[in-house]
Amino acid sequence: MSTGQAPEKSNFSQRCSLLSRYLKEKGSFGNINMGLARKSDLELAGKFDLKGQQNVIKKVETSETRPFKLIQKFSIGEASTSTEDKAIYIDLSEPAKVAPESGNSQLTIFFGGKVMVFNEFPEDKAKEIMEVAKEANHVAVDSKNSQSHMNLDKSNVVIPDLNEPTSSGNNEDQETGQQHQVVERIARRASLHRFFAKRKDRAVARAPYQVNQHGSHLPPKPEMVAPSIKSGQSSQHIATPPKPKAHNHMPMEVDKKEGQSSKNLELKL
């Protein structure tokens, strides 16, 4: 009997030592209340709503179940099986993770400068709307790309020059064009020759009057002919103007001849 009780006492002492170390490191049991509640806490809990009371009860139940589980583990011997005394750190401050409830949620849509909000919108329909929006976006991008390609094609169009002869034209059209050019040149030359011939006839008709006009030269003025008088010279040495030449008397002789010819015509008549 003495041999069977010794290992049980050693296990119990190890557990007690582990608990003492845990308390020294943490300073308290954390959220473990060991089923003990203060009067002030109960009074505050009574002031809350029904929902708040339910939450407090749930927390108390969880806090009661956790220390009992720890005590069971220590009693069974699951805390430490090795010879070395190693403390097990359990963080009891973290609340239990609650899985999100799958249900309807709020949906906001920004479209055309407007904001639309839908409450309690199912997830399936939201996914369908997202797929439709993606397809519409692809269609809009394709249409923009096609328009840009069309604009580039229009800008690259080469306008043919109608003045230049095209390579696809017939040789007959080119020959006829050359013939028309030759005919136009000949017509221009002929019109120029006619114009010059008329000018010659007019010059011949006006020739005698022009000769008489050019033949009569007026005598030069004395101011232009007289040289400048130098200082110390007398007025006697002033040069006399030159005498007019014989051809200056030609207009008088021509007038006399015309008068005689007019008299002869009168006598004949």
From Swiss-Prot:
InterPro entries: CCT_CS, TIFY/JAZ, Tify_dom
Keywords associated with the record: Acetylation, Cell membrane, Jasmonic acid signaling pathway, Membrane, Nucleus, Plant defense, Transcription, Transcription regulation, Ubl conjugation
The keyword Hydrolase is assigned to this record: no
Record-level GO BP terms: defense response; response to jasmonic acid; response to wounding
Signal sequence extent: none
Pfam families attached to this UniProt entry: Jas_motif (PF09425), tify (PF06200)
Family of the protein in this entry: Belongs to the TIFY/JAZ family.
Protein name per Swiss-Prot or TrEMBL: Protein TIFY 11B
